A protein has these predicted regions:
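Short, ordered beta-strand-loop transition motifs
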Residues: 81-84, 179-182, 303-309
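C-terminal accessory/tail domains of diverse enzymes
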Residues: 3, 8-19, 30-34, 38-41, ...
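A generic structural motif
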Residues: 13-15, 94-100, 152, 192-198, ...
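Residue-level recognition of well-ordered beta-strand positions that form the cores
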Residues: 10, 92, 129-131, 189-191, ...
Length: 406
């Protein structure tokens, strides 16, 4: 690209999908960018189901995305040419009334961190699983679907290398890349960092990986169930809290108790689409219950230790989860939990989509973390989305709609 200073101004919609504009200026000064208010009214398939509530009363007047001079991320190397920008910035959204937008979950996560002592010291790592899809006359050269079959990456090496180069150029620190349980299923593990930064990295990494894949004639998808006969893709979250060395068990127990609250009350935030519910019927390294183990991969929660620091892995979120909303609810759960809490007997997870929507709407945890208006709007959107999902005649038809956005 030219040497012109251009900033890609982004914001996450209600589903954690990147929306934005390329602005012809640098990111050293504050900027406000207008967008149609209808963007937050859309379900995951793109239907404006909340348009009468969020856009029509205001004549579809603009929402505004505000970026401060501290929000910019300078881009380097491959990322600059890929995105056509010298910097990237994620802004805060105000609705047409000038108020913080109720479905800006990034802002809600930031607010929780600001008002809650100690949560900022939490560190979160993430593992992003995804599929690459494309026509390839060399498919006969691919190995069978075995985890860590690194020889299989050779067919996609240029695309995957460009993904990693772009992540480097955007300042997104990754730890490792591996093949997952299926041919053309991969995982990128992101380094531990603070909660808001990690949510931003997940958000940006998804957009970057999809953009890179498209430049190679491939589709990178983070939908949860790409095929009913193939392993689902997940978003594993590794959470560690401040630990002074006095009681390692108490630290991990508080994290796990908080996660258990989310599984019981706000499973919708971890498995947010009807497509993601098909994972219940696929044998994979995940659990259908709210169980916990010491290192075991077949449980929903997995207690681990790294460099003397206890952490807990939440293995349940599917790859389509909104990172801001999922991390927000995990932190809210930790905030309400205590190390002295008794960990209850495991219960089966309720994969019924309608039940999850009702549970979220009635959740004390969700209403402690989010304004009532936000909870009601999100539940309403998901109910409309469930109705739209039922209109797809086949799994493949719904999958096709999701591939366009996730």
């Amino acid at each position: 690209m030219s040497g012109a200073a251009r900033t890609l101004v982004l914001f996450p919609d209600a589903h954690g999908i990147a929306r934005g504009k390329l602005v012809n200026r640098d990111c050293t000064r504050a900027v406000r960018v207008g967008f149609s208010s209808g963007v937050f009214s859309k379900d995951v398939y793109g239907h404006p189901v909340l348009f009468p509530v969020l856009a029509k009363p205001f004549g579809a007047a603009d929402i505004k995305v505000d970026v401060t001079d501290h929000d910019g991320r300078e881009l380097e190397g491959f990322a600059t040419g890929l995105l056509g920008a010298s910097a990237i910035a994620i802004g805060a959204v105000t609705d047409p009334r000038g108020d913080p937008h109720p479905l800006d979950f990034r802002a809600h996560l930031g607010n929780l961190l600001e008002r809650t002592t100690g949560l900022c010291e939490t560190r979160i790592g993430a593992e992003l699983e995804f599929y690459l899809i494309g026509d390839d006359d060399r498919v006969h050269l691919a190995p069978d679907g075995q985890a860590y079959a690194f020889g299989g990456i050779g067919l996609r090496q240029r695309c995957l290398s460009d993904m990693l180069d772009a992540l480097d150029g955007a300042g997104i620190v990754w730890r490792d890349l591996s093949q997952e349980n299926e041919h053309d299923q991969y995982e990128i593990a992101l380094a531990h960092t603070d909660p808001l930064e990690q949510a931003d990295r997940i958000f940006l990494a998804r957009m970057i990986c999809r953009t890179v894949a498209a430049s190679h004639g491939l589709r990178c998808t983070f939908i949860a169930v790409e095929h009913k006969d193939r392993s689902p893709s997940n978003l594993h979250l590794h959470v560690s809290a401040r630990f002074d060395g006095s009681d390692m068990n108490a630290s991990s127990k508080r994290i796990a108790s908080g996660m258990r609250h989310v599984l019981d009350e706000a499973f919708l935030t971890l498995s947010p689409t009807r497509n993601s519910r098909h994972a219940q019927n696929i044998a994979s390294f995940r659990s259908g219950a709210s169980d916990i183990s010491d290192g075991g991969r077949f449980s929903a929660l997995r207690r681990l230790e790294e460099d003397g620091t206890p952490r807990v892995e939440l293995r349940t979120p599917t790859s389509d989860a909104n990172p801001y909303l999922a991390i927000l609810l995990v932190l809210a759960g930790m905030n309400t939990a205590a190390a002295s809490d008794a960990f209850p007997e495991p219960r089966p997870l309720d994969f019924d989509f309608a039940n999850s929507i009702t549970a979220f709407e009635e959740s004390r945890l969700a209403r402690a973390a989010l304004p009532d208006e936000t909870v009601s709007l999100y539940a309403s959107m998901k109910r409309h989305e469930a109705q739209k999902a039922a209109e797809f005649a086949t799994f493949e038809a719904e999958r096709g709609a999701l591939l366009k956005v996730l």
